[in-house]
Amino acid sequence: MAVKYKIKKGDEVKVIAGDDKGKVAKVIAVLPKKGQVIVEGVKVAKKAVKPTEKNPNGGFISKEMPIDISNVAKVEG
C-alpha cells in the first residue's frame, strides 16, 4: 500500500539534498508507489529519442527524472 504524502502536484518545494540542493521549484508529478517526486528543472537528464514520423531525425531531449520525496521540503507561503 502506498504511503500518503503531504506534497502534491503543483506545490512549491525546496530541494534539501543532492546535486540540486537549494533549488526551489514546482512539483510536476508525485509517484507515491515509489516514494518519489518529479520537480521542474531538477535532476534533468538527456534522453536519446529514436526517429519517428513526428521527429524523423531523432536526437536527444532533456527530461526531469524522479527524486526521492525525502530530499524535498514543502515551501510554506
Swiss-Prot record:
Family: Belongs to the universal ribosomal protein uL24 family.
Subunit structure: Part of the 50S ribosomal subunit.
GO cellular component terms listed in the entry, alphabetical order: ribonucleoprotein complex; ribosome
Spans traversing the lipid bilayer: none
Entries under Gene3D superfamilies matching the protein: 2.30.30.30
Species: Campylobacter fetus subsp. fetus (strain 82-40)
Source organism superkingdom: Bacteria
Keywords: Ribonucleoprotein, Ribosomal protein, RNA-binding, rRNA-binding
GO biological process: translation
Protein name, UniProt field: Large ribosomal subunit protein uL24
Keyword Ribonucleoprotein on entry: yes
PANTHER family in the cross-refs: MITOCHONDRIAL RIBOSOMAL PROTEIN L24
GO terms for MF: rRNA binding; structural constituent of ribosome
